[in-house]
Amino acid sequence: MATGSQTSWLLTFTLLCLPWPQEAGAFPAMPLSNLFANAVLRAQHLHQLAADTYKEFERAYIPEGQRYSIQNAQAAFCFSETIPAPTGKEEAQQRSDMELLRFSLLLIQSWLGPVQFLSRVFTNSLVFGTSDRVFEKLKDLEEGIQALMRELEDGSLRAGQLLKQTYDKFDTNMRSDDALLKNYGLLSCFKKDLHKAETYLRVMKCRRFVESSCAF
């Protein structure tokens, strides 16, 4: 492995292992730039995990000829499509940081229940088998977003006052066609929602700390 790649991997691993700061006064405050960097790395990691799991599930269970029609039917399936959250980078840039943090938190919290059933669905998955702590990873990102909200608190509407909703749990009966389609749809939403959360966090980080990685 090249020295540059090795250094980059070690830096990413170190940042992913860093704990979030606790309530004010418990520990010295972490710089805001570090809070954003940690949150973005965690969101990227979860989004990649969701995308890999979705692709593996698709290869294993969904015939290639049926994928396009099923994906079209899933277009309005995700509950996140029913909330006024930005759908892309351009729309996200029009929202305040607190709005984006609230939407990110809502998206993450909507998956905390369903993902606890993932390990039962993907017991033999090569992708999921190496990442069976997805619930803990989501909780970690939730804490990071809450830490950012505490730092940026502006006294406006709190995230807890937003309408909260969760997805159905994953179906463990993998012999049922209905269960396969349900899980396929849930994984699609999981991937989309984590992509949104990652996008929101990257937009916030880039406009606060101008850097070359803002082009995404």
UniProtKB/Swiss-Prot annotation:
UniProt: Zn(2+) binding residues: 45, 198
GO molecular function: growth factor activity; growth hormone receptor binding; hormone activity; metal ion binding
PROSITE patterns with a match to the protein in the record: SOMATOTROPIN_1 (PS00266), SOMATOTROPIN_2 (PS00338)
Superkingdom in the source lineage: Eukaryota
Keyword tags: Disulfide bond, Hormone, Metal-binding, Phosphoprotein, Secreted, Signal, Zinc
GO BP term, pick one: positive regulation of receptor signaling pathway via JAK-STAT
Disulfide linkage: 78-189, 206-214
InterPro entries per record: 4_helix_cytokine-like_core (IPR009079), Somatotropin (IPR034975), Somatotropin/Prolactin (IPR001400), Somatotropin_CS (IPR018116)
Modified residue annotations for Phosphoserine: 131
Subcellular location as annotated: Secreted
Any one of the GO CC terms: extracellular space
Signal peptide (UniProt feature, chain positions): 1-26
Predominant localisation class: secreted
Biological function: Plays an important role in growth control. Its major role in stimulating body growth is to stimulate the liver and other tissues to secrete IGF1. It stimulates both the differentiation and proliferation of myoblasts. It also stimulates amino acid uptake and protein synthesis in muscle and other tissues.
Family classification: Belongs to the somatotropin/prolactin family.
The protein's name in its UniProt record: Somatotropin
Gene from which this protein is expressed: GH1
